[in-house]
Amino acid sequence: MPTRPCASRRTVLRGAAAAPVAGLGLAACAAPDGSAAAAPTAPVELGEETEVAKGGAQLYRDHNVVVSRDQDGTLKAYSTICTHAGCPINKLEGTTLICPCHGSRFDAVTGKVVQAPATEQLTELSVKAANGRIVAGPAD
């Protein structure tokens, strides 16, 4: 019966050094309490209506919501919990949301997937402007 070669000391030490780094990568994708709400469960006030320009988007990290405004002035809101692995999306470049865990990209104006690995679009939320403030909540 053939014998397996013993792992060198260097190989063992490399593996031991890499294990904590891999764990940090997984921890970076998790919500602080271990679970992130995919959408507000009640209406939440996000900010001033003027924060979202026509053709632009604003990310509200504390509420896991992105709000965009089309050229006609219509507001749209989406949950910023990635549909691939449930990671909170914390980066907005122009109108593109970028998930830090696996690189999925979403259009903040339509909620549609722009780049895999995600295959499902973001969850749409209800949104309105009330007294100059943006209020988002569960879909109607």
Language-model regions: role of each:
Residues 6, 87, 101:
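Functionally engaged cysteine thiol sites
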Residues 16-21, 52, 98, 114:
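Alpha-helical protein-protein interaction elements
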